[in-house]
């Protein structure tokens, strides 16, 4: 399971280096294979270990091609999906269309989300964090059934 936010850089070829603490689990459990796609609700990328992506793909296969929203979701997630493997230095190339979608240039944030990672432009990540903080402050957590008993 992946957690934590790491500041990373894109090199001139559009590659990122996955932080060392994630490399061994990715290699041992997933043979260093990932699938990168877009987040349909935010301007970031989603990086799934291959076994986790297979679960997502199975759910996508159940969506209807005759329902416009379901078809659009399939089109976005599958159309942008790119399989990759970490090289010996833990690097992976981000295809240009994916970099453009997430406005990635030089500085990025890799954010663990248990079964996957999010990859954000650093400035967009900072903005998202502030928006999330304000949304949580303005929410009546007790009114949300799943959050009513949530305690840290």
From Swiss-Prot:
One of its GO terms (cellular component) is cytoplasm. Keywords: Cytoplasm, DNA-binding, Repeat, Transcription, Transcription regulation. CDD domains: MraZ_C, MraZ_N. Residues 5-52, 81-124 form the SpoVT-AbrB domain. The keyword Secreted does not apply. SUPFAM superfamilies: AbrB/MazE/MraZ-like (SSF89447). Belongs to the MraZ family. This is Transcriptional regulator MraZ. It comes from Shewanella halifaxensis (strain HAW-EB4). The gene is mraZ.
């Amino acid at each position: 399971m992946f957690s934590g936010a790491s500041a990373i850089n894109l090199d001139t070829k559009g590659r990122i280096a996955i932080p060392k603490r994630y490399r061994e689990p990715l290699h041992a459990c997933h043979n260093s294979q990932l699938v990168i796609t877009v987040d349909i609700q935010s301007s970031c990328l989603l990086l799934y270990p291959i076994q986790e992506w297979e679960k997502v793909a199975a759910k996508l296969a159940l969506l209807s091609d005759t329902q416009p929203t379901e078809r659009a979701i399939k089109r976005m997630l599958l159309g942008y999906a790119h399989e990759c493997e970490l090289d010996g230095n833990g690097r992976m190339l981000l295809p240009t269309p994916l970099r453009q979608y997430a406005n990635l240039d030089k500085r990025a944030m890799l954010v663990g989300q248990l079964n996957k990672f999010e990859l954000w432009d650093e400035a967009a990540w900072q903005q998202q964090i502030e928006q999330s903080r304000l949304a949580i402050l303005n929410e009546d957590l007790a009114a949300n059934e799943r959050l009513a008993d949530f305690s840290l």
